[in-house]
């Protein structure tokens, strides 16, 4: 009868020792090496030498041609030997691989027997009264189970590696897939998985439920191309705000002035692009009429002024945070109030009116793609600039020195300063970069609705929430830009789905609040676990 407990203490390399000590397997491997020495191995060696000869800059062309011809002849001879040995080699490989698998089955069976025994012991320990000795025995059983699990994992890895070596380095597709699955299963941690993906799983279930319920609500099918494109269109402009504030959150900060900056840029854009004389005055100045100015100049002017104003106010807030160490929550709150007061008092809250219809269609219109099942399908133009903005931001985050420094400063500002990184410079750069995205977003916001001092109300909360849901930590130094993008789409899709199903607008805030608190709670748990 097999001694089961002996297998429990087998080290993780025990199966390798079994393979090395098996005489029959060693004989197979030696014979295969002999067959390949003058065949496939020699072909590979000669091809390597041939490549070096061709790249040699010292050899003259006549000498190089002679050596190339000689090596080609040797390669042909080695290939002929390999073909002669092919049948015997194939049979040996089949027998050797079968031998390895047989040894693995025996080893795996013995380890599984030991694991069953340890599980039985654990059950017995659980039934007895809790004492110090029983606690020690339980820990011992758990340690033995972990050791057995590692032994099985390393044994299977050795099985695949040995089989590939016997096949001269070749691995079957099935072996690759099974090995990947077993590696994932071995390293899988349910707690970490649900901490990282639990919120997304819950949101995915919610969206699936909405898709299933929608036809029964009498509102039609939710999962259609026009609806998806509408969600992406509504996400496009808000993508600028989330991408901008994401950098500030990465520095363990926040920005409460987004909505007011959007209003400021939108009002300026609306005034400049309005057809004819505008009714809006600013501190008694105006009204203005920019129609004599060429349209291209007006577009560039409105965009430049929107970006310049946003950058100015953002740098104002950033200076107090970077130089005086005032938390961005306070500095951006002050900026928000300043912009709101100046803008509302200066314009009396008067809407700027519509903008030139040609420009509105040029930037904010749609391209007609055709019809699908009797429904006209159009592609929103706003998706294009949003995609470009995300691509530029991704490049800055991942491919530039500023991006690397953002993670360093966000993770530990003091350590970054000691290592020679200018914390002040990085902070100011991030605030300026965020403002550029706000300015562009405010410019495109004008094409959605008439701008006024109240435009953008609450946008900062949606942008910040999108970043948090996307995995950008408030603790700083953790997160990816892609997360902010996904967060924007999730929140926009959530609002669209609830509206599509006829859910009251006020009740939608409840769903948003639950998602935000869940995201922040999971982020806090992950942060505490890392500490």
Curated annotation (Swiss-Prot):
Q: Where in the cell is it found?
A: Cell membrane
The species this protein was found in: Treponema pallidum (strain Nichols)
| Topological relation to the membrane, as annotated | Multi-pass membrane protein
Q: Quote the protein name from its UniProt record.
A: Galactose/methyl galactoside import permease protein MglC
Q: Which domain of life is it from?
A: Bacteria
Disulfide bond annotation, renumbered to this chain:
none
Q: Which UniProt keywords apply?
A: Cell membrane, Membrane, Sugar transport, Transmembrane, Transmembrane helix, Transport
Residue spans crossing the bilayer:
193-213, 239-259, 267-287, 300-320, 326-346, 376-396, 424-444, 461-481, 483-503, 505-525
**What family name appears in the similarity comment?**
Belongs to the binding-protein-dependent transport system permease family. AraH/RbsC subfamily.
Q: What is its main location?
A: membrane
The entry's function note states: Part of the ABC transporter complex MglABC involved in galactose/methyl galactoside import. Probably responsible for the translocation of the substrate across the membrane.
**One GO cellular component term noted in the UniProt record for this chain:** plasma membrane
In Pfam terms, one family for this protein is BPD_transp_2
How it assembles, according to the record, is: The complex is composed of one ATP-binding protein (MglA), two transmembrane proteins (MglC) and a solute-binding protein (MglB).
Does the record bear Transport in its keywords?
A: yes
One GO MF term on file is:
transmembrane transporter activity
Sorted alphabetically, which InterPro entries does this protein's record hold?
Answer: ABC_transp_permease
